[in-house]
Amino acid sequence: MTVEANKETLGFQTEVKQLLHLMIHSLYSNKEIFLRELISNASDAEDKLRFAALKDDKLFEGDSDLKIRLDYDKDAGTITIADNGIGMTRDDVIANLGTIAKSGTAEFLKQLSGDEKKDSKLIGQFGVGFYSAFIVADKVEVFTRKAGEPADNGVHWESKGDGEFTIEPVSREQRGTEIVLHLKPEDKEFADGWKLRSLVKKYSDHISFPVVMKSESEEEDKKGEEETVNDATALWTLPRTEIKDEEYKEFYKHIAHDFEDPLTWSHNKVEGKLDYTSLLYIPKRAPFDLYNREAPRGLKLYVQRVFIMDDAEQFLPLYLRFTKGVIDSNDLSLNVSREILQNDSTVESIRTALTKRVLDMLSKLAKKGGDEYQGFWDEFGTVLKEGPAEDFSNREKIAGLLRFASTHTGEATQNVSLDDYISRMKEGQNKIYYITGDNFAAAKSSPHLEVFRKKGIEVLILSDRIDEWMMGYLSEYDGKQFQDVARGDLDLGEVETEEDKKHQEEAAKEHKDLLERIKTALEDQVQEVRVTNRLTDSPACLVVGQFDMGAQMKKIMEAAGQKVPESKPIFEINVDHPLVQRLETEQGEQRFKELSAVLFDQATLASGEQLKDPGAYVSRLNRLLLELAN
């Protein structure tokens, strides 16, 4: 069979076609990032070979001098990026260049709006890698051979970025990957030695491998010689005092494949009982798969400067999965695996220290005030809310970083800290009050807040799906207990006057018969009927039992297909309300039952719950309206 007969034309996966189209149209204003992306990929390939060769040094094939070559041909209008890294087989090429294996890609692409500015940010969050070549090239060729494979197992891939690609076998002596970009007429300016050198310095100065180009020196003996155009020193190994902010930012873009600067970073070298260096970054924007807890995450792990793996998730807890960075340890062995990392006491110690460091970075950002921490919270707050359940030892610190909506601001924006709340507590108030609801508007207008409005007490409004679950793990902050205003007995502390307490006790005695009649009328729908100290304007409300599951948690469990434990609400009535007073005078038992049911259903709706039988509620209401009309 001839080589030509083995040439195949294949179609790109639908998502790739969409991404190519979007990139070519959305990223033209930042074309030069193609070089950073392709050099980053080449650097990853060198890293992977160096790691694989730890177990089998024959993979070096007699050449362990790892470098990335950059070449150009002005007349032909081409740029070539070549590495002598791990290389690819035919199957690797199809998997890596013809499809996108990231989970959630289709959902991500649905978010794109056609607004070029917004889309370029979203694509930046996604990480475009190899496909960025098509921003400047109208044809891309890839020649590659996997390390350890015979020369005849080379692969030649070619595409014009128009929906399909060809792939054929090729003989290739050199292992690794060579990418040839055939530049678009308007982008021929990139086929220039000075331009390429300046882009390498700008974007790829601190990758770990040398990027070499042919010397353009006028001196005869140096012409055509290779020269290294980047620093090629791993950035994290340098003293902090020698690193400019701009270099930190570019290094972040290299490891995170992000287009934007990071929000903040922390570079730290630890010596002594543990010996490691960490460089941690907080991104400005959430990646598209942030809420997928199974998505790859973690830090780039190096052991004694040797790359080991990309997504070492064992060094940070899941609730800090947005953190990017590098960890370089001298205490781990070079043959470390993911399994070993899970059970290593050194890793556990480093994880504890890095978790504290990330939380300290966030605390520092929060103390600065301004928009930066608010921006972080808007992007990553929901994930940080997983923290109290996952990290008992740092619970207080995490709680201090949480932000809430509140009756103080009256707005849905989550910008109130617990310290803010405590600073505004009323004299005699000893608890932090909060309410949970399906959405901000429903929670804000809940009848449970009436007594708090009357007494001028601030209540935190929690309307994210995760909130009720999170509060199950937060019992107190700064010595103050949390209280859900719609759960159990409401303790207002010394804010509730003796007169208030006396009024409630007397009302309970005076209306004992009414409470019993309502309980009988509602049969097994409620666990208790009692006089309220929560309401000032509404006739009645539902209260969740102290140890029962709230509405939010029930919905989460139902959505997960889990059985929800049976529980009945407490029905509280406001005996000073005209409707309740009218109910008390009703002699007819059937009509009393109907009125009690209407009050109960209204209280159910006001608490954000669904009615079990909406039709029956509407019928009762219609009968009452007809009576009024007659």
Swiss-Prot record:
GO terms for molecular function: ATP binding; ATP hydrolysis activity; ATP-dependent protein folding chaperone; unfolded protein binding. Residues 556-630 are annotated as: C. Homodimer. One of its GO terms (cellular component) is cytoplasm. Residues 339-555 are annotated as: B. This is Chaperone protein HtpG. Molecular chaperone. Has ATPase activity. Belongs to the heat shock protein 90 family. Gene3D superfamilies: 3.30.230.80, 3.40.50.11260, Heat shock protein 90, C-terminal domain (1.20.120.790), Histidine kinase-like ATPase, C-terminal domain (3.30.565.10). Its main location: cytoplasm. The keyword ATP-binding applies. HAMAP family: HSP90 (MF_00505). Keywords: ATP-binding, Chaperone, Cytoplasm, Nucleotide-binding, Stress response. It is found in: Cytoplasm. Residues 1-338 are annotated as: A. It holds the Pfam family HATPase_c_3. SMART domains: HATPase_c.
